[in-house]
Curated annotation (Swiss-Prot):
Protein name per UniProt: Pyridoxal 5'-phosphate synthase subunit PdxT
GO terms for MF: glutaminase activity; pyridoxal 5'-phosphate synthase (glutamine hydrolysing) activity
UniProt: L-glutamine binding residues: G52, E53, S54, R108, I136, R137
Native source species: Haemophilus ducreyi (strain 35000HP / ATCC 700724)
Enzyme Commission identifier(s): 4.3.3.6, 3.5.1.2
HAMAP family associated with the record: PdxT
Active-site residues (renumbered): C81, H172, E174
SUPFAM superfamilies given in the database record: Class I glutamine amidotransferase-like
Pathway terms, separated by semicolons: Cofactor biosynthesis; pyridoxal 5'-phosphate biosynthesis
Subunit structure: In the presence of PdxS, forms a dodecamer of heterodimers. Only shows activity in the heterodimer.
Pfam families xrefs: SNO
UniProt function note: Catalyzes the hydrolysis of glutamine to glutamate and ammonia as part of the biosynthesis of pyridoxal 5'-phosphate. The resulting ammonia molecule is channeled to the active site of PdxS.
Gene that this polypeptide is encoded by: pdxT
Example GO biological process: glutamine catabolic process
Length: 189
């Protein structure tokens, strides 16, 4: 395993499974911090945008002065569920685009309501065995730009993609005991 002990990875701590993301980061040997203030972004080598509700997360980012700084943050980012929506440059249904860091078009709540949540083994490019993907009111990617690499699909829908050092993940890897998706982010450091 690579040595990530000299790196600090932040988890945007406005909504979502912040503690679970921090545990996965620490399980790989990196330092993890909950990010609530814009000044904390300067300490980071990478960032996780967790799940939650994307419109509410944007309002909270704006209220905390984080939104404009996150638009220019150019270090590795993993966006999970609502974090994927924050990274997209187009959102079906007219929702305002947020950080627009990836050339992807997304459909919010594409897998249904909370009651429709599920876990499934998912084949992920670069991983030696299926990943136990947890989908909760998950979005999916309907279109990708030419510089976007599709890493996983579920039933013909893109659910994990990479553009440069940005990762958009429709499912919740932090809700499993499998840290391989987080390791993909840390491998960018």
């Amino acid at each position: 395993m690579a040595d990530y002990s000299r790196y600090t990875v932040g988890v945007l701590a406005l909504q979502g499974a912040v503690t679970e993301h921090i545990s996965q980061i620490e399980s790989l040997g990196a330092k993890a911090i909950a990010v609530k203030q814009v000044e904390q972004l300067n300490q980071l080598d990478a960032l996780v945008l967790p799940g939650g509700e994307s419109t509410a997360m944007r309002r909270l980012m704006e209220a905390n002065g984080l939104f404009e700084r996150l638009k220019t943050f150019d270090k590795p980012i993993l966006g999970t569920c609502a974090g994927l929506i924050l990274l997209a440059d187009e959102i079906i249904g007219g929702e305002q685009v947020h950080l627009a860091k990836m050339a992807i078009k997304v459909q919010r709540n594409a897998f249904g309501r909370q009651i429709d949540s599920f876990q499934t083994p998912l084949t992920v490019s670069g991983l030696d065995k299926p990943f136990p993907a947890v989908f909760i009111r998950a979005p999916y990617i309907t279109e990708v730009g030419e510089n976007v690499e599709v890493l996983a699909e579920w039933q013909g829908n893109v659910v994990l993609a990479k553009q440069g050092h940005f990762f958009a993940c429709a499912f919740h890897p932090e809700l499993t005991n499998d840290n391989r998706i987080m390791a993909l982010l840390l491998a960018q450091l």
